[in-house]
């Protein structure tokens, strides 16, 4: 006969012809005596009598925590209970026929030997066959049921209760806290499991309710761009002889903007820094003073049932019991291991052919085989004709317009011009002469002492964005920061009106094939669900093959290498519940959490005298769950208890509140629009049919012949605007757009009338520094006055490195300078302004009549005048050569979402690939050990709202999800009114027995 092997339960077995009955086996060896029964644990004490619970008394004044009482002496161990009866020894059963080798059973708990079962019916004697080889000894039978615990011994006498410490004097009342700002009311979190009640902390005086907080802004503005690096400050020349103040020159036209340089290569990514060491746990602060107890709050919701407690320690083994009488006959033992195959006997004469048996039941389907090797990819078929263009879908809503982008970085300051020669003492003004040629720049003078700081100048025009700098080396990893408090939930902004849908562009010609890309990038975000495909024709089902005979079991081969994990197989039927496994070892103690904030240090009271133990009072009402206490010291590991029954699945937790809306990123540059292709012919719109119910998915049939190309349908009516979809992933920043053309310079203003220079007055005494006046409007440039005599050549200073000259702009028409205004009183010293770009050099004036005067003594440096306006922005210099490729920088945060670009042209439809064969379902692997729960990651910022995706098909109902993490504790709500006194509750459960008292 063919046996049934559970390890190959999936195969189909074919019943073979019945073989001749073998000889009756010899009686098996006597069974091993059962193990010694465990002594039962001591009996539980009787339940104390319960009476009706009286009303709760008024709360007494809070007292300080008294000093720890003296530890009670260990109680005497209880008397050992009488030994339980010993199970009867079973009679030896008859040895069964050698069966197939069964799988190894789970090791159960050693229990007392069970009662022997009734003897089986005697088999009919079979025809004498050849004597087989003696079979091997059968495996050890499954352990019997665990013996019942013996009668419990008498309970030990209850020890005296320890003396209760005297209540300390009440601590001082803490000062009333300032009224807090009420935050947004947090969503009600799922009630977590009721924790152990911790020690009551100090209760401060209730603060006054604060005013309602203002509504949050719609969203913060984008971060301002980083200022460009200022250029190198030129050396200050030696203070020369103060010359006559020159007239400001006319403002020249701005030159054309230079082309932008190519972006530099992306640097390599730096090595990650070493993780910082975890900081030491802070010391536990002393408990603060106990505040005045407030009125009792409303009764909280009933907490969930706590987790099952750890099993108690196993009692000491009792003395061996008396030997019991013989028990009833035990159940027959398990089949023994199959013996070695005996030598083949002589072939007997064939017997008469028996009648044809009835067909047997169909065997179980075999297990799915290993997945076959992946077939070779076939050659691509010829491209089929283009399919019909479907009707256009409804236009999606335009996204909300993003806020303006951050200002670009400030451009670098232009090259500092060389200072001109200082003029000598002003002579008698001569008649204005003709304009002479421009003189050469003099050498720079020696660096003078730094002057007082001038007032801060106005902010200059926005410079062009600088090229990105090289990626710096990664800094060392800092210590882990403390977790911040959860921020208040912002007010959701108003949803903007949907913009009009843009017209669809014409299809452009396909572009040339691009170069081969680099390494594969990171996997992208999961895309939205596509539209359901067309249902294929069901294929023909093949004929089932005949099941082959079951072969002999081969020897176990060497263990192969671990294969690749297969796909998730079809879930099998739920098997029977196996015997309970051995209890696992207790897990390691987790790391201690961060210590909470320390309360104010209270004054330590003097320890009171030890009072007499009072009678136990009635059990009070169940108070609200207290805060979690500090983790206690790790105790000694107890004996492993028996595995409890699996509890029912908890209810599904409520859906958490939506997270705060993240900041809307700044719009990126608008991409270039592609070239338009030739427009196609417009077809007639087809009639829209009724949408039928979706049918069952059939097997994919063979691809049909390509159909004719249909005409393009007309544009359908615009559908209703759907609700906004979930926020999409932030797309990569688009390429920068081309620079616009620079406008032409404006015409010069009218020339002012020339003024007559007045005589030079006598220098007055230096006045007191007055308050800085308000900055007046800039006047028109005046006419040029007579130029002074040229000054003597100053000492040459150290020449600085000259930067690359920028392109020279077209010279502007110089207007006539106006007359010099009176010197105003010096203003207060302000902060130094930024270095402005050098203005255009004026023409050199004529030399006036008269001999040059002797140089005057250098006067005291005058007060710094008001800072002038920033000059015109210099032209952008040519792009320098590309520097060496730096190390690749770490991946930066996602950039702001750019504006929605124009809809690209629809590319040509690609060839339809050959449908691959469906892979075999892999064998279901063994369940791995449960991983340790990871830490909860920080909440990510919510992205901007993306367009609504197509409606997906209804998915199968998922399993009940686990309870979500409890939400953050919301701010305290307003104080509720005092409720009516409730009815007296039922008596509480009896408390745990107290510790044994001293003997």
Curated annotation (Swiss-Prot):
The modification Allysine is found at residue 7. The modification 5-hydroxylysine is found at residues 101, 266, 341, 559, 670, 841, 903, 915. Expressed in bones. The keyword Amino-acid biosynthesis does not apply. Residues 115-131, 149-167, 215-254, 374-400, 462-489, 522-535, 592-606, 619-646, 675-691, 720-729, 739-754, 816-831, 885-899, 933-966 have a biased composition (Low complexity). Contains mostly 4-hydroxyproline. Proline residues at the third position of the tripeptide repeating unit (G-X-Y) are hydroxylated in some or all of the chains. Residues 321-330 have a biased composition (Gly residues). Trimers of one alpha 2(I) and two alpha 1(I) chains. Belongs to the fibrillar collagen family. This is Collagen alpha-1(I) chain. It comes from Choloepus hoffmanni (Hoffmann's two-fingered sloth). The lineage of its organism: Eukaryota, Metazoa, Chordata, Craniata, Vertebrata.
């Amino acid at each position: 006969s063919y046996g049934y092997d559970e390890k190959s339960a999936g195969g189909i077995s074919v019943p073979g012809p019945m073989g001749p009955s073998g000889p009756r086996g010899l009686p098996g060896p006597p069974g091993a005596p059962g193990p010694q029964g465990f002594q039962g644990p001591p009996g539980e004490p009787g339940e104390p009598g319960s009476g009706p619970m009286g009303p709760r008394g008024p709360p007494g004044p809070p007292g300080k925590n008294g000093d720890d009482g003296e530890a009670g002496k260990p109680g005497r161990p209880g008397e050992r209970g009488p030994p339980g009866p010993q199970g009867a020894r079973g009679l030896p059963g008859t040895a069964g026929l050698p069966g197939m080798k069964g799988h190894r059973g789970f090791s159960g708990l050693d229990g007392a030997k069970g009662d022997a079962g009734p003897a089986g019916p005697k088999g009919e004697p079979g025809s004498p066959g050849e004597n087989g080889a003696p079979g091997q000894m059968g495996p050890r039978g499954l352990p019997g049921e665990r013996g019942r615990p013996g009668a419990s011994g008498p309970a030990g006498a209850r020890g005296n209760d320890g003396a209760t410490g005297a209540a300390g004097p009440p601590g001082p009342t803490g000062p009333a806290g300032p009224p807090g700002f009420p935050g947004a009311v947090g969503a009600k979190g799922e009630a977590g499991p009721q924790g152990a009640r911790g020690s009551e902390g100090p209760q401060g005086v209730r603060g006054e309710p604060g005013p309602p907080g203002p509504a949050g802004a719609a969203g913060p503005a984008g971060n301002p761009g980083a200022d460009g690096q200022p250029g190198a400050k030129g050396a200050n020349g030696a203070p020369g002889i103060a010359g006559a103040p020159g007239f400001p020159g006319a403002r020249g036209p701005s030159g054309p903007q230079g082309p932008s340089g190519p972006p530099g290569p992306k640097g390599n990514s730096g090595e990650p820094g070493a993780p910082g060491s975890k900081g030491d746990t802070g010391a536990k602060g002393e408990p603060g003073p106990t505040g005045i107890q407030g009125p009792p709050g409303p009764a909280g919701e009933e907490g969930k049932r706590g987790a099952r407690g750890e099993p108690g320690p196993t009692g000491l083994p009792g003395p061996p019991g008396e030997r019991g009488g013989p028990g009833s006959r035990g159940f027959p033992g398990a089949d023994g291991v199959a013996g070695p195959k005996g030598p083949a006997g002589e072939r007997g004469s064939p017997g008469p052919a028996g009648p044809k048996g009835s067909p047997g039941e169909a065997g179980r389907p075999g297990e799915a085989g290993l997945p076959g090797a992946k077939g070779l990819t076939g050659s691509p078929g010829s491209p089929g004709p283009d399919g019909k263009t479907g009707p256009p879908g409804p236009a999606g809503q335009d996204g909300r317009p993003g806020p303006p982008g951050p200002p670009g970085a400030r451009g670098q300051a232009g090259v500092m011009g060389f200072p001109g020669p200082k003029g000598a003492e002003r002579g008698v003004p001569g008649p204005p002469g003709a304009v002479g040629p421009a003189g050469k720049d003099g050498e720079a003078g020696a660096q003078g002492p730094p002057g007082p700081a001038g007032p801060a100048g106005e902010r200059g025009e926005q410079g062009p964005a600088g090229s990105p700098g090289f990626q710096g080396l990664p800094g060392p990893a800092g210590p882990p920061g403390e977790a911040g408090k959860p921020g208040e939930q912002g007010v959701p902004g108003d949803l903007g009106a949907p913009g009009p849908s843009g017209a669809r562009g014409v299809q452009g010609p396909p572009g040339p094939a691009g170069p081969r890309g680099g390494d594969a990038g990171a996997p992208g975000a999961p895309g939205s669900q596509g539209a359901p495909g067309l249902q294929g024709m069901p294929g023909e089902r093949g004929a089932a093959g005949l099941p082959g005979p079951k072969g002999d079991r081969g020897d176990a081969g060497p263990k192969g290498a671990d294969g690749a994990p297969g796909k998730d197989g079809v879930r099998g039927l739920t098997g029977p519940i196996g015997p309970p496994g051995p209890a696992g070892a207790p897990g390691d103690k987790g790391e201690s959490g961060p210590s909470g904030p320390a309360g104010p240090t209270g004054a330590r009271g003097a320890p009171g005298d030890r009072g007499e133990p009072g009678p136990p009072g009635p059990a009070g009402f169940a108070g609200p769950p207290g805060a979690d206490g500090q983790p206690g010291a790790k105790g000694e590991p107890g004996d492993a208890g028996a595995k409890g029954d699996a509890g029912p699945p908890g209810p599904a937790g409520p859906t958490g509140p939506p997270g705060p809306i993240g900041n809307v990123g700044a719009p990126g540059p608008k991409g270039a629009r592609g070239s338009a292709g030739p427009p196609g012919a417009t077809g007639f719109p087809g009639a829209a049919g009724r949408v039928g119910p979706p049918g069952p998915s059939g097997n994919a049939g063979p691809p049909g012949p390509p159909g004719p190309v249909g005409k393009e349908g007309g544009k359908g009516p615009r559908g209703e605007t759907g609700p906004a979809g979930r926020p999409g992933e932030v797309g990569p920043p688009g390429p920068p757009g081309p620079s616009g053309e620079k406008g032409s310079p404006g015409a010069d203003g009218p020339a002012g009338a020339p003024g007559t220079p007045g005589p030079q007055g006598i220098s007055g005494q230096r006045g007191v520094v007055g308050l800085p006046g308000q900055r007046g409007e800039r006047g028109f440039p005046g006419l040029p006055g007579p130029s002074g005599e040229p000054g003597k050549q100053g000492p040459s200073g150290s020449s600085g490195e000259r930067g690359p000259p920028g392109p020279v702009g077209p010279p502007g028409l110089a207007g006539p300078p106006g007359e010099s205004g009176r010197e105003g009183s010096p203003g207060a010293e302000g902060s130094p302004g930024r270095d402005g770009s050098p203005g255009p050099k004026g023409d050199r004036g004529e030399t006036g009549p008269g001999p040059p005067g002797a140089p005057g003594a250098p006067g005291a440096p005058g007060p710094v005048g008001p800072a002038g306006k920033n000059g015109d922005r210099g032209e952008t210099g040519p792009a320098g050569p590309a520097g060496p490729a730096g190390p690749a920088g770490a991946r930066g945060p996602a950039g702001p979402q750019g504006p929605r670009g124009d809809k690209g042209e629809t590319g040509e439809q690609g060839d339809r690939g050959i449908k691959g064969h469906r892979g075999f379902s892999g064998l279901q692997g063994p369940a791995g050990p449960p991983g340790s729960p990871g830490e909860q990651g920080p909440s990510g910022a919510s992205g901007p709202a993306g367009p609504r995706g197509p409606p997906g098909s209804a998915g199968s109902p998922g399993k009940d999800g686990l309870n979500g993490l409890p939400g953050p504790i919301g701010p305290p709500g307003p104080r509720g009114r005092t409720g009516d006194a409730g009815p007296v509750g039922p008596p509480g459960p009896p408390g745990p027995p107290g510790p044994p008292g001293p003997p």
